[in-house]
Amino acid sequence: MVDDSTRKTLSNIPLLQIRAGPREKDVWVQRLKEEYHALIMYVKNNKQSGSDWFRLESNKEGTKWFGKCWYMHNLLKYEFDVEFDIPVTYPTTAPEIALPELDGKTAKMYRGGKICLTDHFKPLWARNVPKFGIAHAMALGLAPWLAVEVPDLIEKGIITYKEK
């Protein structure tokens, strides 16, 4: 079900242990430390392998996340804003990652630019609570979505390259 490349990526992202969401204020701080550690390791591994593709930051409480993600297609870099909130029932409920500027441009998206992850990612997340975190959502949710949807949107002329 999971290919070798995905398995290798996953093996380089630390699994999380603390089961806490934003409502559990004291324990949430510990969970956030685990989240940041996993994200730092994932980004570091991406840079080392030449596949750096996103930047994220959060508000002080760690409940709102935002940043940029990008996808390379035919040697052109397509960049998108990315954002998501941590659900109050996290980590039982996965974050809903949104790319607001692509809202309404593909059927594999919900209102507000939230990408569709129900068929493949959410069952995997549910089997791995509380071990999966934000880095896993990026690796197993957003990355494959970008790899499938962005080239299709480019080929259809729905999104075009913007000079920087």
Curated annotation (Swiss-Prot):
It comes from the Eukaryota. Keywords: Ubl conjugation pathway. InterPro entries: UBQ-conjugating_enzyme/RWD, Ufc1. It holds the Pfam family UFC1. Gene3D superfamilies: Ubiquitin Conjugating Enzyme (3.10.110.10). GO terms for biological process: protein K69-linked ufmylation. GO terms for cellular component: cytoplasm. The active site is at C116 (glycyl thioester intermediate). The keyword Magnesium does not apply. GO terms for molecular function: UFM1 conjugating enzyme activity. Belongs to the ubiquitin-conjugating enzyme family. UFC1 subfamily. E2-like enzyme which forms an intermediate with UFM1 via a thioester linkage. This is Ubiquitin-fold modifier-conjugating enzyme 1. It comes from Drosophila persimilis.
